[in-house]
Every structure is written in C-alpha cells, then in structure tokens.
Amino acid sequence: MKNIYWVSGLVLPFCSLQILKAEKQSNIIFIITDQQRGDALGCSGNERIITPNIDALAHDGYYFSNAYSATPSSTPARAGLLTGMTPWHHGMLGYGNVAEHYRYELPQMLSDCGYLTLGIGKMHWKPQNALHGFDATILDESGRVESPYFMSDYRKWFQTVALGKDPDETGIGWNDHAAATYKLNENLHPTVWTADVAVRTIEHYEGEKPLFLKISFARPHSPYDPPKRLLDKYQDIEMEAPIHSDWSKDIGADLTDPKADPTAAFAQFDDEYVKNSKKHYYAAITFIDEQVGRIVKALKDKGLYDNSIICFTSDHGDMMGDHHHWRKTYAYEGSSAIPYIVKFPKTLKTVKPVGTVVENPVELRDFLPTFVELAGGNVPADIDGKSLVTLVRDSLPQWRKWIDMEHATCYSEDNYWCALTDGKIKYIWFVHTGEEQLFDLVNDPKEMKDVSKERKYKKQIKDLRAAMVQHLSERGDGWVKDGKLVVRKKSMLYSPNYPQK
C-alpha cells in the first residue's frame, strides 16, 4: 500500500510499511551542496560570507575543520558518500559514471534498518533516475540530460508554472566562471524549489517510520546566479583577491581574457573579475543558507529538530581563481576542503560539548558508518569510513592519521595526483611526472609556498612519501615497486573494484 503526497506540484509515492517505530530511532536530515569551498561559511572563520542559519547549526552541533573530499569532483565524491569507501575500493578514481549498484549503499542500508529513505535535488547518478535504495527521489539534475527519455522533476515543474520561460535564461553555462543575477522570479530558482520540496516533505511526514531525507542543492556550482537582493547584501563587502603563489605564477599565463574561454580551467584573469564571480558565488551560498533556515524551522515546527541528526556538507570545493585554477579536481584547499557540520540528537551522550570544533581529519565516506551506527544497524568491518560518533563520544578516540585523496587526469595531462593530508600538512604526488608538493597548512593555510625542497621539511616529506607508498601498495607493481612510487604515463579512471554490470 502506498500513500500519495502532493509535494510542490509533484506526486511522490511514500512506502508506508511499518518495520520499526520511528520514536526509537533518530531522523537523519542530510543537506549537501554542490561545489562549496570549505572556507565558504561564517563558522569557518570567514567574515565576508553571510551564513547565519548554517552557522547556527554548527553552534548546535560540531564543526569539523579538517574535512576533505577524497576525489574532488561530483560523481566520485558522491560514490564515496554512497558507499562509505575510498576511491580505490568503490572504483572511481576520477570524474566518470557512478555504478548502477554497489555492495554497500547508504539509502539501502538505512532502509534495511527500517527507515523511509527519500532523496531531493541533485543525485548525479547514471541512469539519472536510479534509486540506490531510496524509496523515492525527486530530482533536479542541473540541466544534465543523459537520455532522451529523461527530464528532471524540477524541469517538469518549471514547465507547468512558468510556461514559455527559459530556466537557463541567465545565460551562463554549467562550468562558466562568469556570474550574473537570476533573471526570473527567485521562487522559480532550483535552490528555492529544492527547499520547497524538502519543507513540504517534512510537513507531511507522518512518523510511521524514521526518516532519512537527503536534500541536495545544485548550487553554488556554476552558474553563479543568486537573486539581486542577496548580491546587494555584498555591495559593501570587499572580496578577498584570489591567491597568487610563486609555484603557480606560470599557470594559465596564456589566457587573460575571460571571454576567450568561458569555461577555462586555468587562466590569469584580472583580480576584479575574479572577485565579482566570488561575490556572486557567496551570494548563492547565502541563498542556500536561507533555505537551510526554512528547513530547520520546518523541523522545529514539527517537533523533530532536537532528536534528529542534521548534517551539512558539500561534494567538493571550487578554486575560484586561486593559484589561477578554476572549479575542482585539484588537491589544493579550494578544491578539496569541504564544509562539514553534524548536529547529533540530544539523546546522544557526548564528552565534547556542542559547538566544539573537531580537528580530526574526516571525509564524505564517514557519514555512512555514522548513520548506520545511530540507526542501530551493523557497520560492515570492511567499510573504509569511520563513525563520527567516536569523535564526540569517546575521551580518547582512535582515529585515522591521514585522509587519502586522488584524481585521475582531468582538464590537463599533468593534473593526475594522489595526496595525503591531516589538515595540518599536505603531501601531493603527481602520478604522471613524479613531482611532489608539500604544504605546511598550519603556517601557510593558503598554500602559498611549496616546501617540498626545503631542508627543514626533509623528514616530513620522507615520512609522507613512505605513507603514500604504504597507501598505494595494495594496488600492485603498477603503483609501487621495490618500495618506491611508480610514475604512471597512463591515467586510470576506474579501479578493478568498480562494479561491473
């Protein structure tokens, strides 16, 4: 039997099987954005950005200051979130297609624990209407159409309420570095639509089963197109100039005119142009922040806030012109560091007070074991992620030393790398060339100076190189031979662990 709820003009089927009583398990509200830098929140220490609602969530929970995306582009990052696995173990080493099915899938595992599992917004899976264990999804796929038979639910809705209008009227592409304000009524914007569906879902939630609700915003990924009223809030806020460094001084030097290549991955644009794009980007995040406020209010009005697990994160960051790089796929902080906030239910006993900043290195893979543990399920021993509960509940938590990161070739032949970081120091190995970089993030959080050749850091780079050898050794002689890292001339997009049909 199915109950039918009307959500933002769309029909959503909700399974109504009663497996477990909802009051015995906490609801899980998982909010994820697309391409949001880790420093693009007020609670990160950024005084230029306006995010009061997300900051309030951090005040009620925990802000994880050293959070990373292991493979910082959309699809492999989302595969890690879905499976709780490292890139090598879920199989995606760069930007490719999420597999149709995995042995471990977060929505299915929570469904097995008795949860109603619903996904709203951008999933970025293939096929695009795949469920991966969700009872239902309502999709906004940002204009991506990978089949002539697919149209996202947002686009269907847009056609019914804005007949004759163009949802892409702003005229900026999905990978453009330019920016402009949204040209239509802001209630037509996908950011509002995603929140509308989420709020109505919460309002109609009957509590027969505990709820896992994934709310996935397609912004602030380009197009950077906030409403003008929010851009106006930044009128008197001077944006920080893009980061320039000696090691990146020649990158993108052949391209200085933004109009010459609207989607350039490397360019040396004028600082004012970059600052304008960043201002729109920040305003787009403030737009999302407003929607987070609406979602939190709906939870409070329904009496669900206190006993819910509420998370806020992103799949990866956006370089925004730092070191003359744009978008993602890089090991540098702008691309790989992500926002990461968890508000646990009040019933969870913790040793760390709420509002604490947690410095242990965490990654998207850690959400799966966290949710499964709190849902009362069994976390498989071979899951790579670690439950975040350990970090707030235990006085002396056992935790990993490093986060491993990597990305197969993308945007340029030499952008093929593996990295290790704990948020304090970062080692990068360029797989095609054998070159190395080392950044002291404590003293140089903007990665201005590559210290890999400095005598002072000789021991650190030796130790990190050895740690990388250990990390990659399971991959065989093509990666590590005779205890040394192997330079690879051919990029590998999928590991042997990628599920075959």
Task: Indicate where each model-derived feature is located.
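Formylglycine-dependent sulfatase
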Residues: 2-4, 8, 20-430, 435-436, ...
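Extracellular C-type lectin-like domains
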Residues: 439
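Residues forming the ATP-binding cleft of Hanks-type serine/threonine protein kinase domains
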Residues: 442
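Core hydrophobic alpha-helical transmembrane segments of single-pass membrane proteins
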Residues: 10-12
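C-terminal segment of classical bacterial N-terminal signal peptides
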Residues: 14-19
